[in-house]
């Protein structure tokens, strides 16, 4: 058996506002506590803003943590905490000598932190811009990859199409003058016609309705013009020059003159037996040929 405990009249007992039975039946989760939206000095962690970055921190390794602690603003925050703890110790221990120095130190750290917080805000905005640019860059990368994939698929489809057989004999590459081509085309144009398929094409003008003469008319005209000067055509085909033609004409004229002289000499040697009769015949022929069908005096005779 436990010994009986005597009541101490000098000891005060806690007074509860809730009955004992109600306290025993109360669930642990229903204990009243400070709400999340109310700032509490007893729980300063609740004063921090809750965001996706704080819930899932990017610091996952010891090296990342050391790098984070080496930042200047983090060092100043640590110094601010240490100074604040020193001030609280001075107040609790009534050390007035160090209190004034610690207060001045914490004020200087606070002013420096204000300027750094403004820079931190600027860096935060820059970080948001960097994230937007990274997202845009990733979208552009995805779009470029999609375009490249489509181009590769189109290239494969084009390569799968049948190809024309490669010509075994390629052109020698010799250049041909335009004048030679035009001359050859003019020669072919005299003896060629339009293909038969062009006659059945819609809105096709018949060759007979052209402004210029048809091919048959051109050929007939060329044949008629060539029949008037056969000697020149033969000379052109044989390749004789103009000097040779002139020389041949001179030779022919000389031969004709020699023949006329020979005939006159021969007639004079045999005598002028038939001169009177030939003169009469010439006069009769000239009289018969000199027919003046238009007489100007007949108009005024009436």
Curated annotation (Swiss-Prot):
<feature type="region of interest" description="Disordered">
    <location>
        <begin position="239"/>
        <end position="302"/>
    </location>
</feature>
<protein>
    <recommendedName>
        <fullName>Mediator of RNA polymerase II transcription subunit 4</fullName>
    </recommendedName>
</protein>
<dbReference type="GO" id="GO:0016592">
    <property type="term" value="C:mediator complex"/>
</dbReference>
<feature type="coiled-coil region">
    <location>
        <begin position="98"/>
        <end position="145"/>
    </location>
</feature>
<keyword id="KW-0804">Transcription</keyword>
<comment type="function">
    <text>Component of the Mediator complex, a coactivator involved in the regulated transcription of nearly all RNA polymerase II-dependent genes. Mediator functions as a bridge to convey information from gene-specific regulatory proteins to the basal RNA polymerase II transcription machinery. Mediator is recruited to promoters by direct interactions with regulatory proteins and serves as a scaffold for the assembly of a functional preinitiation complex with RNA polymerase II and the general transcription factors.</text>
</comment>
<feature type="compositionally biased region" description="Low complexity">
    <location>
        <begin position="268"/>
        <end position="278"/>
    </location>
</feature>
<dbReference type="GO" id="GO:0003712">
    <property type="term" value="F:transcription coregulator activity"/>
</dbReference>
<dbReference type="InterPro" id="IPR019258">
    <property type="entry name" value="Mediator_Med4"/>
</dbReference>
<keyword id="KW-0175">Coiled coil</keyword>
<keyword id="KW-0010">Activator</keyword>
<keyword id="KW-0805">Transcription regulation</keyword>
<feature type="compositionally biased region" description="Basic and acidic residues">
    <location>
        <begin position="242"/>
        <end position="265"/>
    </location>
</feature>
<dbReference type="Pfam" id="PF10018">
    <property type="entry name" value="Med4"/>
</dbReference>
<dbReference type="GO" id="GO:0006357">
    <property type="term" value="P:regulation of transcription by RNA polymerase II"/>
</dbReference>
<feature type="compositionally biased region" description="Acidic residues">
    <location>
        <begin position="292"/>
        <end position="302"/>
    </location>
</feature>
<comment type="similarity">
    <text>Belongs to the Mediator complex subunit 4 family.</text>
</comment>
<keyword id="KW-0539">Nucleus</keyword>
<dbReference type="GO" id="GO:0070847">
    <property type="term" value="C:core mediator complex"/>
</dbReference>
<comment type="subunit">
    <text>Component of the Mediator complex.</text>
</comment>
